[in-house]
């Protein structure tokens, strides 16, 4: 690894540690020329599928966009940030497991709705009302009936 201070190519690894999550390796290094120390991090690089929007355009998958939409749906609801992050991790796991290069925005939306339904029924209804573009009260009532039916079964 090239030293960021003097540019010398030879460095020595002094210490290596794994992050608690197990997805990052931290290495403490020392330059053999100038003797200065620096830290490097190694992370797994994941390639999410491109998201194909309804108009046919393609955009990169954006975790923050998913997180923001979930946080908006769950605003003032008793759902922790950790629970949202775990839900997003499950969504991303499903996106990666398909191994496809592209995925429709509708499929991403359905994955978000499934996770919101697990987390909080009110958040699910809020998201569904915007995502499915309800035109009238009957469509809203259908989703309410669906949620009520799942609560009765439990």
From Swiss-Prot:
Q: Which residues form the ATP-cone domain?
A: 49-139
GO BP of this protein: negative regulation of DNA-templated transcription
Alphabetical UniProt keywords: ATP-binding, DNA-binding, Metal-binding, Nucleotide-binding, Repressor, Transcription, Transcription regulation, Zinc, Zinc-finger
The record describes how the cofactor is bound as: Binds 1 zinc ion.
InterPro entries tied to this protein: ATP-cone_dom (IPR005144), NrdR-like_N (IPR055173), RNR_NrdR-like (IPR003796)
Where are zinc fingers of the kind unnamed found along the chain? Answer: 3-34
UniProt GO MF annotations: ATP binding; DNA binding; zinc ion binding
Question: Which is a Pfam family this sequence falls into?
Answer: ATP-cone
Which cofactor does this sequence's record say it needs? Zn(2+)
Position of the signal peptide: none
What is the annotated role of this protein in its UniProt record?
Negatively regulates transcription of bacterial ribonucleotide reductase nrd genes and operons by binding to NrdR-boxes.
Per the record, the similarity remark reads: Belongs to the NrdR family.
What NCBIfam families would the database entry show?
transcriptional regulator NrdR
Q: Which PANTHER family match?
A: TRANSCRIPTIONAL REPRESSOR NRDR
Protein name per the record: Transcriptional repressor NrdR
Organism per entry:
Ralstonia pickettii (strain 12J)
The taxonomy runs: Bacteria, Pseudomonadati, Pseudomonadota, Betaproteobacteria, Burkholderiales
